[in-house]
Amino acid sequence: MLNLARMVDIKPQSGTHVAPINLKLMEMEQFARYTLEKEILNRLRGRVTPRQEEEYRSNIETYRVLEADMSQPDRTARMLELDNAFHRKSFELCGMEAHYDHMLASLQHVERIRKFSLQTEENKSVCSSHTAILEALLHGSADDVSEALESHLSRYKQSVAQARSVHPEYFIDE
């Protein structure tokens, strides 16, 4: 399975090695994610209840507090969980959470970069990006939702640039 997902390279008589992050596959994964998530957000746009809005805002605030406290145990894993919960929320509210779970499971190369980005300065924009998505969801047009989501999901390019400058051997452009 990992070989099919291009997560490992199997070399007969030599062994199995972690495959470099395939930037072309990562771009495809990210486009599929953007397309699906944009559709879900637009189905929900303008229909979020005050209680649901508060749940979104609570998630953002919890993330902000965790982000500021480097001493928190399991901080990186918890931040990733909060990020996933923020994005999954719109799928849940549309009754399509299984679609989110399936999508997340298919994002092999993107997930590797997401985990790296939690340890960089680029990560500092998550709360403001999530707030922009929420505001577009509450009060914006389809174009506003699209722009906020595109801005947020394209952050991975900065993470790739940072990681690639330090470890170019971790990436391939195939």
Question: How should each PLM-predicted stretch be described?
Answer:
Residues K24, P50-K115, V126-E135, D144-S159:
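Conserved amphipathic alpha-helical segments that form helical-bundle/coiled-coil interaction surfaces
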Residues M1, K11-P12, E27, E61-T62, ...:
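Short, flexible segments with low predicted structural confidence
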Residues E122-K124:
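Active-site loop of classical SDR/Rossmann-like NAD(P)-dependent oxidoreductases
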Residues R45, G95, Q119-T120:
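Short helix-capping/hinge motifs at transmembrane helix termini and TM-loop junctions
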Residues M1-G46, K157, A161-E174:
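Short linear motifs at protein or domain termini
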Residues N22, S117-T120:
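Solvent-exposed, flexible loop/coil residues
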